[in-house]
A protein has these predicted regions:
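The feature marks proteins involved in alpha-glucan
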Residues: 1-49, 78-157, 180-258
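Short beta-strand motif preference
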Residues: 54, 66, 153, 163-165, ...
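Acidic/polar N-terminal loop/beta-strand segments that form early-domain functional surfaces
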Residues: 57-59, 69, 100, 168, ...
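Short proline/glycine-enriched turn/loop motifs at strand-loop junctions of beta-rich domains
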Residues: 57-63, 156-163
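Aromatic-rich, solvent-exposed beta-strand/loop patch
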Residues: 164-173, 252-258
Length: 258
């Protein structure tokens, strides 16, 4: 007699999520006010008892879902543009966010799943005041980080309570893009995937006195024409043609050269 297969079939479709642990009132308040030093500790994906918690801050969105292997799982709204949920996973997976707005939908990489895009040597030299190429370490630098194209935003603001990136496509509201403090260096950093050349931006500074200011980037490679004051994401495409001269410049003693 043939044996009957009584095994339970593998479930198909997205894994259902559960309610995420609430943020503390202090963390939530500082995050929404733009005065949190480490938004990456609150947003993105993190292990918690029972799985992985996903949390996103998208103040203009109608809904946000986590996309894993092509399957969407909706996050619950916490109010104030925060969306969250816990998925029963053993480890943080590769994922994207599907964000629905009144005017359309988009699937994007989560800025808060990336490690810092500025190295320890840069931070050490900035902290000691000995960095000789600050224009490469600070400002808006288009790059590919962890395999994803985007732009690294960095600014030196040692006395700020918080810093956010405000752009033309967020209507100069920096709420959804708070930056993280990189310790005693005084540098704030955020990698924004998918943001490229031509994007207009400013830094939204939250001072220690509770005031907020929109500031142009002091290390900007390009700026708008007056009376507009925004900085513009720009990469250098200049190609030097002095390789032959550089190769032979040591052939002549410096005091004998013209």
């Amino acid at each position: 007699m043939a044996l009957k297969d009584t095994s339970i079939p593998e479930p198909s479709g997205p894994v259902p999520g559960t309610t995420a642990p609430a943020l503390s009132p202090e963390d939530r308040g500082r995050l929404l006010a733009g005065a949190h030093h480490d938004p990456h500790a609150l947003l993105g994906a993190h292990p918690v008892p029972g799985g992985i918690v996903f949390r996103a801050l998208r103040p203009f969105a109608r809904s946000v879902s986590v996309v894993i292997d092509g399957q969407r799982t909706a996050l619950a709204s916490e109010g104030d543009g925060l969306f969250s949920g816990v998925l029963p996973l053993a480890a943080i997976p590769a994922y994207t966010l599907h964000v629905a707005y009144d005017g359309g939908e988009q699937e994007v990489h989560d800025p808060y799943r990336f490690l810092p895009a500025l190295g320890e040597l840069d931070l050490h030299l900035i902290r000691e005041g000995r960095h000789e190429q600050l224009w490469q370490a600070l400002g808006a630098q288009p790059m590919t980080h962890e395999g994803v194209p985007g732009t690294r935003f960095t600014v030196w603001a040692p006395n700020a309570q918080g810093v956010r990136v405000a752009t033309d496509f967020t209507y100069w509201d920096g709420t959804q893009f708070p930056m993280r403090s990189l310790g005693a260096s005084g540098v704030w950093e955020l990698f924004l995937p998918g943001v490229g050349e031509g994007t207009a931006y400013k830094f939204e500074i939250h001072s220690r006195y509770g005031h907020r200011f929109l500031k142009a980037d002091p290390m900007a490679r390009r700026c708008e024409e007056p009376p507009n004051t925004a900085s513009i994401v720009t990469a250098s495409h200049y190609e030097w043609g002095d390789a032959e001269w550089m190769a032979h410049r040591a052939d002549t003693p410096v005091h004998e050269a013209p």
